[in-house]
């Protein structure tokens, strides 16, 4: 089960053009986004460690998304 709140996910889907969004759809997207964010976070952490830092910076996240 995703830790992300469902209401903001619902708003994102509506912002993308949907008129109505089922709770299951919002939950499914929340779960996917959480999994993706964790993977990006892991890669960003690797970039920070490789640079000799404990702190993950925005540039690490940008690189992780592109990797």
Swiss-Prot record:
Where can this protein be found?
Answer: Cytoplasm; Chromosome
* GO cellular component terms attached to this protein's record: chromosome; cytoplasm
The record's keywords, sorted A to Z, are:
Chromosome, Cytoplasm, DNA-binding
Q: Where is this region: Interaction with DNA?
A: 20-22, 54-57
* InterPro entries referenced in this protein's UniProt entry, alphabetically: Archaeal_histone_HMF, CBFA_NFYB_domain, Histone-fold, HmfB-like
Under the heading SUPFAM superfamilies, the entry gives: Histone-fold (SSF47113)
Q: Which CDD domains match?
A: HFD_archaea_histone-like
Q: What is its main location?
A: cytoplasm
For this protein, the record's Pfam families field holds: CBFD_NFYB_HMF
GO terms for molecular function, please?
A: DNA binding; protein heterodimerization activity
Q: Which family does it belong to?
A: Belongs to the archaeal histone HMF family.
What is annotated about its quaternary structure and interactions?
Heterodimer. Dimers then assemble into higher oligomers, with the DNA wrapped around the protein core.
Q: What role does it play?
A: Binds and compact DNA (95 to 150 base pairs) to form nucleosome-like structures that contain positive DNA supercoils. Increases the resistance of DNA to thermal denaturation (in vitro).
Protein name (database record): Archaeal histone HAN1 subunit A
Q: Which organism is it from?
A: Thermococcus zilligii
- Gene giving rise to this polypeptide: han1A
């Amino acid at each position: 089960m995703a830790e992300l709140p469902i209401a903001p996910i619902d708003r994102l889907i509506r912002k993308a053009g949907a008129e109505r969004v089922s709770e299951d759809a919002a939950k499914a997207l929340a779960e996917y986004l959480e999994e993706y964010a964790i993977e990006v976070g892991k890669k960003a952490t690797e970039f920070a460690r490789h640079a000799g830092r404990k702190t993950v910076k925005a540039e690490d996240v940008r690189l992780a998304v592109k990797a």
